[in-house]
C-alpha cells in the first residue's frame, strides 16, 4: 500500500473520531427543573440576599444508573461500610431512577467478606445480610455556602426500627465510608494552633509547610452537616426529651470536641460544659429539642496523644406517618464565616418550618468554626445495630448476629424489622442555591481558598478500595449495547448505532445517554490545581486501543513502504529483481497491578470483599 492509499483510512479515522468524542457542555442545573424554582428566597428573615439555582437533579429520566463512571453528578459506591456498626453492604445495583424519583432500595442480600479482627490480628470469613445504596457527589460537584433543599419520602415503616435514611453534606477532604480518608481529618473545622491537638489534626494551623497546595498555618478538615437522619421505632416516652419516635435529627459534627465533663448519653448537658446559644423551635406543634442521645464520638488511637474527640451539636424534631407515605421537604441554609473564622450560621427547616440553628459564636467553647470547606452531597440508607436496635442488649441475647430468619438472631432485632424489606427511599429532587455576588459562596471541589485536588491526588489510596484503578472512573459517554434508539434515551439524548451501541448527543452522557452533563460556570479553582483543557472529554478504552493500533499500523506500514520504495529503486539501478518484504508485528504486553488499601487500624472489625465461594453458605 502506498502512502496515498492511506487517505481513505485517514478519512474514516477522522469521521470515527468526530462520532466518538463529544465536548460535554451543560451547567449543573438540570434542564428538567421548572423555571419557577431557578431562584429562591431564604427562610432566614435577616438574610436579604437574592439566591439563584446553581445545581439541581430532578431525577425525571427513568433508568439512570450510578455505577462509578456512569453519571456526572453521583457515584453509587460499591463496597462494604466499615462505620457505625453497619450491617449492610453498599451496592450500585440498589440505586436507580424510576417513575421520576431516585430510588435507593434496601434489600435482603447475602454478601461474603474476608474480615480482619484487630484483636486477634487474623482474617476470617464473614457475611452481611442487607444490601443498600449510598450516592455521593464527592470530587464531582461541591459547593461552599448556600441553600440545599431535598424532597424525599422516607423508607420503611415509621414504627419499625432498623433503617437509617440520611441526607447530608461532608467536606471533600474525606470520602464517606473510606475510613482511611477520614482519620485525623473528619470532622475538623478548626483553624487555631494548639500544640496539644496538632498531632490529631493532620492539616493543622501549627504547620509552616504548604504541601499539596495547602496554605501554611491553616487548619483544614472535613466537617459534616446532617440535614436529616431519620430514627424509626416504637412510639414510647424517651428519657430527657418530649420528642418521640419517629424523629428527624439535624446535626453539625465538628472537631476538636469538648474533652472534660462531657454530657452523659440520655441526659441533658450540665450548664457551662456544653455548647450554648443554639436556637430551637418552641412551637408545641413543631417543637424541636436538643438531641440527648448523640453528643459525638471519641476516635481512639495509639499512642493516646493521637486520640481526639468529635462533637455533634444535634437537635430532634418529631415526624408523623405521612413522612413515610409521601414527599416532604428538608432544607439547610448555610453561610460560612468570614475569612477570620468569625460568624456564619447553619439553619435547618422541614416543610418550610424552622427546626434548629447554630451560629459561629455558639462554638466558642472549643474554638471550632462554622464550616468553610467545600462540601459534597450524600444520600443513603444505612442499617446499623447502633441505630434503632434494642438497647441495652436483651437479657440472655448475645446481640452478635442480625440475620432475618435465624432463630438465634431474633432476640437482637427490632420488632417487625424483617418485614421492612424491601424498603425504598424515594428522592424527588435535590436543589442547591447560592447568593448572588457573595464571595463566601463558591462552587468547586478544590476552591482557591481551600484547595483539595493535590492532597487527594497525593493520597489516592485513601479514597480507593482494593482493586480500584482510581478513585473515580471517567464518565462514560455512550457505549452501552442497544437495539433501538429508545435504549439510548430517545432521539433527544442519543442514537443506537448500526453496530449496536449508544452514541450520545451533546449535553447528554452516561453509558445510555440518560444523564444531563454538567460543568461549573463560575468555578473557584486553586492556582495549584493542575487542569487539562480536555478534562470533560471521555475516550472509551476500546477507542483508545483502536487509535493506538491504527497509529502503530500506519507508521509501520508507512516506514516499510518508504523502505521498499527505496530498495526497489536501488535494485532497479543494479538490475536486480524486485524485493517482496514482509513485516511481522510482535505482540505488545502490559501489566495491570493494583495495591490493596487497608483501612487504618481501628478497634472495630473491618472488611474487604472476597470471592463469595470462599465463604461457607
Language-model-detected regions and their locations in the chain:
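Polybasic, lysine/arginine-rich low-complexity segments
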Residues: 585, 601-603
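N-terminal secretory signal peptides that target proteins for export/translocation
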Residues: 1-6
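Proline-rich intrinsically disordered regions
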Residues: 596-598
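GH16 jelly-roll
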Residues: 25-580, 587-590, 607-617
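Cleavable N-terminal signal peptides of Sec/SRP-targeted secreted and luminal proteins
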Residues: 8-25
Amino acid at each position: 500500500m502506498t502512502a496515498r492509499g492511506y487517505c481513505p483510512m485517514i478519512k474514516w479515522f477522522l469521521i470515527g473520531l468526530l462520532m466518538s468524542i463529544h465536548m460535554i457542555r451543560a451547567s449543573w442545573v438540570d434542564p428538567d427543573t421548572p423555571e419557577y424554582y431557578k431562584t429562591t428566597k431564604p427562610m432566614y428573615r435577616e438574610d436579604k440576599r437574592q439566591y439563584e439555582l446553581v445545581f439541581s437533579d430532578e431525577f425525571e429520566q427513568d433508568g439512570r444508573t450510578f455505577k462509578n463512571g456512569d453519571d456526572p453528578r453521583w457515584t453509587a459506591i460499591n463496597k462494604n461500610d466499615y462505620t457505625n456498626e453497619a450491617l449492610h453492604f453498599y451496592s450500585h445495583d440498589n440505586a436507580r431512577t424510576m417513575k421520576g424519583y431516585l430510588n435507593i432500595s434496601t434489600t435482603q442480600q447475602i454478601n461474603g467478606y474476608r474480615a480482619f479482627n484487630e484483636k486477634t490480628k487474623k482474617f476470617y470469613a464473614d457475611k452481611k445480610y442487607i444490601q443498600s445504596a449510598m450516592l455521593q457527589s464527592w470530587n464531582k460537584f461541591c459547593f461552599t455556602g448556600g441553600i440545599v433543599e431535598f424532597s424525599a419520602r422516607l423508607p420503611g415503616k415509621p414504627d419499625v426500627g432498623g433503617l437509617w435514611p440520611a441526607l447530608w453534606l461532608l467536606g471533600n477532604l474525606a470520602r464517606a465510608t473510606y475510613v482511611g480518608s477520614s482519620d485525623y481529618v473528619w470532622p475538623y473545622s478548626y483553624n487555631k494552633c494548639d500544640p496539644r491537638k496538632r498531632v490529631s489534626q493532620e492539616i493543622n494551623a501549627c504547620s509552616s509547610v504548604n504541601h499539596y497546595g495547602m496554605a501554611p498555618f491553616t487548619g483544614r478538615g472535613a466537617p459534616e452537616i446532617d440535614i436529616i437522619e431519620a430514627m424509626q421505632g416504637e412510639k414510647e416516652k424517651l428519657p430527657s426529651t418530649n420528642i418521640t419516635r419517629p424523629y428527624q435529627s439535624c446535626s453539625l459534627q465538628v472537631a476538636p470536641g469538648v474533652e472534660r465533663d462531657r454530657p452523659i448519653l440520655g441526659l441533658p448537658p450540665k450548664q457551662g460544659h456544653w455548647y450554648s446559644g443554639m436556637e430551637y423551635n418552641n412551637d408545641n406543634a413543631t417543637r424541636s429539642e436538643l438531641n440527648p442521645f448523640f453528643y459525638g464520638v471519641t476516635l481512639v488511637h495509639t499512642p493516646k496523644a493521637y486520640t481526639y474527640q468529635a462533637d455533634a451539636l444535634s437537635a430532634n424534631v418529631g415526624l408523623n406517618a405521612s413522612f413515610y407515605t409521601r414527599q416532604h421537604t428538608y432544607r439547610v441554609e448555610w453561610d460560612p464565616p468570614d475569612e477570620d473564622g468569625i460568624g456564619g450560621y447553619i439553619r435547618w427547616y422541614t416543610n418550610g418550618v424552622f427546626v434548629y440553628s447554630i451560629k459561629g459564636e455558639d462554638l466558642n467553647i472549643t474554638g471550632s468554626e462554622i464550616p468553610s470547606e467545600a462540601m459534597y452531597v450524600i444520600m443513603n440508607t444505612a442499617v446499623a445495630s447502633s441505630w434503632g436496635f434494642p438497647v441495652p442488649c436483651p437479657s440472655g441475647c448475645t446481640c452478635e448476629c442480625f440475620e432475618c430468619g435465624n432463630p438465634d438472631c431474633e432476640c437482637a432485632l427490632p420488632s417487625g424489622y424483617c418485614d421492612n424489606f424491601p424498603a425504598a427511599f424515594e428522592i424527588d429532587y435535590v436543589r442547591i442555591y447560592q447568593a448572588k455576588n457573595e464571595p463566601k459562596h463558591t462552587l468547586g471541589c478544590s476552591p482557591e481558598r481551600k484547595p483539595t485536588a493535590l492532597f487527594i491526588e497525593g493520597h489516592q489510596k485513601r479514597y480507593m478500595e482494593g482493586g480500584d484503578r482510581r478513585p473515580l472512573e471517567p464518565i462514560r459517554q455512550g457505549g452501552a449495547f442497544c437495539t433501538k434508539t429508545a435504549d439510548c434515551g430517545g432521539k433527544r439524548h442519543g442514537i443506537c448505532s448500526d453496530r449496536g451501541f449508544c452514541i450520545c448527543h451533546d449535553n447528554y452522557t452516561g453509558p445510555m445517554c440518560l444523564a444531563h452533563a454538567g460543568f461549573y460556570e463560575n468555578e473557584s479553582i486553586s492556582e495549584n490545581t493542575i487542569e487539562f483543557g480536555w478534562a470533560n472529554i471521555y475516550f472509551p478504552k476500546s477507542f483508545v486501543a483502536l487509535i493506538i493500533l491504527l497509529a502503530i499500523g500506519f507508521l509501520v506500514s508507512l516506514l516499510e513502504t518508504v523502505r521498499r520504495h527505496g530498495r526497489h529503486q536501488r535494485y532497479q539501478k543494479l538490475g536486480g529483481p524486485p524485493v517482496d518484504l514482509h513485516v511481522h508485528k510482535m505482540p505488545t504486553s502490559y501489566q495491570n497491578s493494583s495495591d490493596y488499601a487497608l483501612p487504618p487500624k481501628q478497634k472495630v472489625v473491618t472488611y474487604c470483599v472476597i470471592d463469595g465461594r470462599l465463604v461457607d453458605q
